[in-house]
A protein has these predicted regions:
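Structural and coupling elements of P-loop NTPases
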Residues: 1-602
């Protein structure tokens, strides 16, 4: 295929605006997939994606299409996720494209992620084709979409196309416009063969599989290659493209998107964003990759059965190969044994990674309460980065603790503006500006502590705006706050797995909730157990588990009260002695009960 007949593009949009459905129609119209193999969400290969109806990974596919001008064009489509947690997936997919189809749901209009994704595409200098989707629905409001496009995105309404991903109306016209508007890949004048790895996965039989966009030269089976980041050399076992399954072919040439299988067995050998070059025709410098992505949310993941530690470690290595934003390092806890401290982009990302470990790798795991990275300034002038409450130094040595803030753009119908502002303020946030998107919608810019949006901010926003509110956020630096370490003591012994760093105003509430939950989860012993929540040595909440006791008065019928009192006193002495030497074994279920409790209504 000549370079001028290739078009590389991706579909970007807010969550649920119909990206995967539109991709299904394109596959059907171009005849890429046989009629009998067609099914909804065809590109979403993971069970988890189908169940939740969301896209988690970007999916590449090659289509051939003849618009009627006598040429057959090669269209490389990449379907991308819509959630803010996966915006890194989107930005990587954009690196492999020359153009983007921006979808807008005709019933919802422009939403927060629409704005965020179009900014990513503009930053990559991509040609954008605005498309209004779902025009077959009775609730479609095209005029509102045109207004918002001109107001918020600054795109003239004449550029927009109207399609229905469900019925297929307007999709053929969209394919013609993609060929007309999106430029073909440029031929590079630089020397050396080079391809950019924009994704990868691990195959049990064939090892590492790299998804690449070839920039210069040609890769074929048997080519000797070298990776730029670590200098590892290898030989290509297979090259091919996606149809949507992997299909081997003879060669991958400049401009095309496909996969190559180097002879690498270890997941650690290859990195997403790396450049692959031909050892015999090397490139002088690596291709511009991606910005390193920094995890925002941290959580400990431990195997429920400690013997499975090595298996969990291997599973995480394979998962990290497929999910570049996931990072982990080994750690140990006195209560939970050996495990890993893991970093994620957001709460949904954390949930998905845990679910994938359970399903794809059959791991029984336990996850600790999510936290963020705090900057702890000591009185000695030293700065510590703390993502685990266990490593927080003694309060007397701390000068101040700074927590990460985010700048959030919340898009909501005007009627809910008061509720949304109250929600932001209840999470210790400040609304900095409000701007009108159109007659019925506003964009609220707010600054909030990252920790506050971890648990239920998104859910609450959705429910109070009847599902119409949407948000997108970016980091906004660190600020000092009244953060304290909340310790949970069982029988006077602190349990590290339950420690957390919280704002002083919420410490009592949080401590009380954990204590109540533990009271239900720990079985009664022969002596009384005190469960206490403490901040810096001061107990702020307490629950007591009553002891089990034998009825020592059962054999006394009538008789003097002193006899009964003597027996009761004797029992009391025994219980006191038992308490001194007694150890409380906290069952695994108690950890699960507390750590699974994501409904900490702060």
């Amino acid at each position: 295929v000549k370079l001028e007949l290739i078009r590389n593009f991706c579909i970007i949009a807010h969550i649920d605006h119909g990206k995967s459905t539109l991709a299904d129609r394109m596959l059907e119209i171009t005849g890429t997939v046989a009629k009998r193999d067609l099914q909804d969400q065809l590109l979403d290969g993971m069970d988890l994606e189908r169940e939740r109806g969301i896209t988690i990974k970007s999916h590449p596919v090659r289509m051939h299409y003849d618009p009627g001008d006598g040429n057959t064009y090669e269209l490389n489509l990449i379907d991308t996720p819509g959630h803010v947690d996966f915006s890194y997936e989107v930005s990587r997919s954009l690196c492999a494209c020359e153009g983007a189809v921006l979808l807008i749901d005709a019933t919802q209009g422009v939403q927060a992620q629409t704005v965020a994704n179009i900014n990513l595409a503009i930053a990559q200098n991509l040609k954008i084709i605005p498309v209004i989707n779902k025009i077959d629905l009775p609730a479609a409001n095209l005029e509102l979409c045109f207004e918002q496009m001109e107001e918020v995105l600054a795109i003239p309404r004449e550029e927009a196309l109207k399609v229905s991903g469900k019925t297929g109306e307007g999709v053929a016209e969209l394919l013609n416009e993609i060929i007309r508007r999106i430029p073909p890949p440029e031929e590079s004048s630089e020397k050396g063969t080079a391809a950019l790895i924009f994704d990868s996965q691990y195959d049990t039989f064939r090892g590492v599989v790299n998804f690449v966009r070839v920039r210069r030269g040609t890769f074929r089976r048997g080519t000797k290659i070298r990776l730029f980041s670590n200098g590892i050399t290898s030989e290509i076992k297979e090259v091919g493209f996606f149809n949507p399954r992997m299909l081997p072919c003879d060669e991958l040439r400049a401009g095309s998107v496909g996969y190559l299988i180097p002879n690498l067995k270890s997941p650690a050998d290859t990195r997403i964003g790396d450049t692959v070059t031909d050892s015999d025709d090397p490139a002088a410098s690596p291709l511009p990759g991606f910005r390193e992505v920094r995890p925002m949310v941290f959580s400990g993941i431990y195997p429920i059965d400690t013997d499975e530690y090595d298996q969990l470690k291997a599973s995480m290595g394979k998962l990290q190969l497929n999910d570049a934003a996931f990072v982990y390092q080994a750690e140990s806890s006195a209560a939970l044994g050996f495990g890993f401290r893991c970093g994620f982009l957001g709460l949904l990302h954390m949930e998905i990674v845990q679910e994938r470990l359970r399903r794809e790798y059959n791991m029984d795991i336990l996850a600790t309460y999510p936290s963020v990275i705090y900057h702890v300034y000591l009185k000695s002038g030293e700065l510590l980065n703390v993502d685990n409450p266990v490593y927080l130094p003694d309060p007397s040595a701390i000068d101040r603790i700074e927590e990460p803030f985010i700048k959030s753009h919340i898009m909501t119908p005007t009627t809910y503006i008061g509720d949304v502002m109250n929600l932001v303020m209840s999470k210790r946030g400040v609304c900095t500006e409000t701007a009108s998107a159109d007659a019925g919608h506003v964009i609220i810019t707010a600054e909030l502590p990252m920790h506050e949006i971890l648990i239920d901010f998104h859910d609450k926003l959705k429910s109070m705006t009847r599902g119409y509110g949407s948000m997108d956020y970016e980091p906004a630096g660190y600020r000092a706050g009244k953060m304290v370490k909340l310790d949970i003591l069982v029988n006077g012994e602190p349990v590290d797995a339950f420690s957390s760093i919280v704002h002083a105003d919420f410490a009592y509430e949080r401590g009380r909730q954990i204590a109540e939950r533990l009271k239900e989860a720990i079985p009664p012993q022969m002596f009384q157990i005190a469960i206490q929540a403490a901040v810096g040595g001061k107990v702020i909440a307490r629950e007591t588990i009553r002891q089990l006791r034998k009825n020592v008065l059962a054999k006394c019928y009538g008789g003097d009260i002193t006899r009964k009192r003597k027996l009761l006193e004797k029992q009391k002495e025994g219980k006191k002695r038992m308490k001194l030497i007694g150890q409380v074994n906290i069952p695994q279920e108690a950890f699960v009960a507390v750590l699974k409790a994501q409904e900490f209504n702060q």
